[in-house]
Curated annotation (Swiss-Prot):
Listed GO MF terms: D5 dopamine receptor binding; G protein activity; G-protein beta/gamma-subunit complex binding; GTP binding; GTPase activity; metal ion binding; protein phosphatase 2A binding; protein phosphatase activator activity
Residue numbers spanned by region G2 motif: 198-206
Full protein name: Guanine nucleotide-binding protein subunit alpha-12
Source organism per UniProt: Rattus norvegicus (Rat)
Its job: Guanine nucleotide-binding proteins (G proteins) are involved as modulators or transducers in various transmembrane signaling systems. Activates effector molecule RhoA by binding and activating RhoGEFs (ARHGEF12/LARG). GNA12-dependent Rho signaling subsequently regulates transcription factor AP-1 (activating protein-1). GNA12-dependent Rho signaling also regulates protein phosphatese 2A activation causing dephosphorylation of its target proteins. Promotes tumor cell invasion and metastasis by activating RhoA/ROCK signaling pathway and up-regulating pro-inflammatory cytokine production.
Location in or out of the cell: Cell membrane; Lateral cell membrane; Cytoplasm
Modified residues (Phosphothreonine): 206
Gene: Gna12
Domain called G-alpha: residue spans: 54-379
Amino acid sequence: MSGVVRTLSRCLLPAEAGARERRAGAARDAEREARRRSRDIDALLARERRAVRRLVKILLLGAGESGKSTFLKQMRIIHGREFDQKALLEFRDTIFDNILKGSRVLVDARDKLGIPWQHSENEKHGMFLMAFENKAGLPVEPATFQLYVPALSALWRDSGIREAFSRRSEFQLGESVKYFLDNLDRIGQLNYFPSKQDILLARKATKGIVEHDFVIKKIPFKMVDVGGQRSQRQKWFQCFDGITSILFMVSSSEYDQVLMEDRRTNRLVESMNIFETIVNNKLFFNVSIILFLNKMDLLVEKVKSVSIKKHFPDFKGDPHRLEDVQRYLVQCFDRKRRNRGKPLFHHFTTAIDTENIRFVFHAVKDTILQENLKDIMLQ
């Protein structure tokens, strides 16, 4: 009996040894595969880290209506991303809305300011326009907009409405209303599609966070626009991670205007207060902050007739001399900085002027790369 067992054992031993070798081989293969996968993951993570390190993330900050969204549109235009049909239709809807709402504001302001009509028959045009309501927030169709074009044209020609417009610092009126009303014959056509200039001047408050990605000399840029109204500012903190630079935008021409939110606070003072909070925040100690004093085209015109000294009594100089006003504006923001070791980079800009923004952003890009990305290796 024992001989039989020994014989069976000798027969089974090679089979067991082969199984052990196969198991060991499988384990070695699995280990090699695990090491390969680990190397692949490490390489992927390294590529992602390099990509994140190379990404230039620019945050656009500033009070409402300072020109952030217009600047972002310019980045799309300058870097070759055309607006598709859907976007053009949305801009058309926004432009119709800007015209109708702006004209209603002017009709209402004329009445409240006690300005008489030049032509009494325009009162019925005014009443027709004031009866317009779009409670559902639905887009205004071109055929519907055309019904209002005769009334809009007649009202815009009336000296009573023009006088109300000249006193627009006393109430809230969008800056693009004049441009659109001046171009009403073109915009009122049934087959109207917005031009690039129309798109730049279309005003719609930013809600939430809007991003735009583009590449310059193989360096990826991400530009982030966040709503500037007081109700939107709590969303700013969601965007602070990984910031390379902040472009802080100010409407330089609004020194005689108050906020839409409270109708008391001077708009320029509000911008200075926001800037002070941002520029002195420890989170941004190593972040370059570049000041854009925007709407230069409007500032040039306003300085001629509206004295900044009336609203800022500490102003020294000629209130109707552009260079004196510009110098004062830069000083106002510069005084808000506690860290005097870093320079304040600033530019006077006109966000609706593509060539101006192209030139300024070229300089800004160089500043950002020199100040914050000296370790970037261009491929």
